């Protein structure tokens, strides 16, 4: 299916330069310039906090929905290829998730590469998740009803946090929501890296450049905490909701991850989104198709976070 006309028009109008050409500092400026603004959504509170982490304090933003708590808790890890973007650039989606799913969203400003190579980011995300589980009552949350979520490289962080929580003593998670996830270092370029190499937002070269910044060496990609698709087993992971953009270099690995979860017996909603490109959530409030994806997400989260255990 061709790109949605609105997405295609926006991509053609974008005047962006390759990150490899810009370098890290200017890449960060360019990436933030394209971030959506805050939606007009009422929440009970939005506050910034500092979380003790393995490399020092981790900045985080807590979005508390209206209504009577305690609310379930959704950890959120922002996208940006392990290198760019931050808390501010993802207000647009965190506010929607908090209001739509009636959960406290804890957005984590994990350490970025190249200043902080792998595994700094995943270590921060696990530490923040454990902190939120232990301190949820302080912000109107229920630490026994938690899920993880993220976009792109943030979805990598969410998937890895779910794996590590399973293998390294918790906390117990009720679900994981992965939007167009990065799940595997491209040792051999998948077909989608070639089909959608240019002209669809996230280019093949930008994604390869991100990996170069993130890993000390390609050998580190064998670690499932870097490439969660390489985990030995998906059994025992929390239920998953995985959304994959059709026209995206990450399409194939996103589908492969969802399929591996299903094959391992993990209850998984896997949805390829026709006519979309990477970062399609930025069209929330503009494209009905994107709003439908979010409506599905809200309903799915309400289901896994409010049902009784057992």
Indicate residue ranges for each PLM-predicted region.
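Hydrolase active-site cap/lid region
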Residues: 163-219
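Catalytic active-site module of serine/aspartate enzymes centered on a nucleophile-bearing elbow/loop
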Residues: 285-310
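Short beta-strand element of the alpha/beta-hydrolase
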Residues: 70-80
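Short amphipathic alpha-helix adjacent to the substrate-entry channel of hydrolases
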Residues: 88-107
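Gly/Ser-rich "nucleophile elbow"/oxyanion-hole loop immediately N-terminal to the catalytic nucleophile
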Residues: 133-148, 168
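Short beta-strand/loop motif that positions the catalytic acidic residue
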Residues: 242-244
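Alpha/beta-hydrolase active-site loop
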Residues: 116-136
């Amino acid at each position: 299916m061709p790109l949605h006309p609105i997405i295609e028009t926006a991509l053609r109008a974008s005047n962006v330069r390759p990150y490899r050409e810009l370098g890290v500092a200017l890449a960060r400026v360019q990436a933030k310039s394209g971030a959506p603004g805050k939606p007009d959504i009422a929440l009970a509170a939005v506050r910034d906090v500092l979380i003790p982490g393995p490399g020092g304090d981790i900045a985080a933003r807590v979005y508390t929905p209206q209504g009577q708590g305690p609310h379930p808790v959704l950890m959120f890890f922002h996208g940006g290829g392990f290198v760019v973007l931050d808390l501010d650039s993802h207000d647009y989606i965190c506010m929607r998730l908090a209001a739509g799913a009636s959960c406290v969203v804890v957005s984590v400003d994990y350490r970025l590469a190249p200043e902080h190579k792998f595994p700094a980011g995943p270590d921060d995300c696990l530490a923040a998740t454990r902190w939120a589980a232990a301190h949820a009552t302080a912000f109107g949350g229920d630490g026994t009803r938690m899920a993880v979520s993220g976009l792109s490289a943030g979805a990598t962080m969410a998937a890895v946090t779910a794996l590590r929580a399973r293998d390294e003593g918790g906390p117990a998670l009720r679900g994981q929501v992965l939007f167009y996830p990065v799940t595997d270092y491209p040792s051999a370029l998948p077909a989608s890296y070639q089909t959608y190499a240019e002209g669809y937002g996230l280019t093949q070269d930008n994604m390869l450049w991100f990996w170069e910044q993130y890993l000390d060496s390609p050998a580190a990609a064998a670690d499932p905490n870097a490439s969660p698709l390489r985990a030995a087993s998906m059994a025992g992971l929390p239920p998953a909701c995985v959304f994959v953009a059709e026209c995206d270099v990450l399409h194939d690995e996103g589908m492969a991850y969802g399929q591996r979860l299903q094959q391992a017996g993990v209850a998984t909603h896997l949805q390829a989104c026709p006519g979309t490109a990477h970062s399609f959530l930025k069209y929330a409030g503009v494209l009905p198709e994107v709003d439908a994806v979010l409506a599905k997400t809200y309903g799915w989260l309400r289901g896994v976070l409010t049902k009784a255990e057992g």
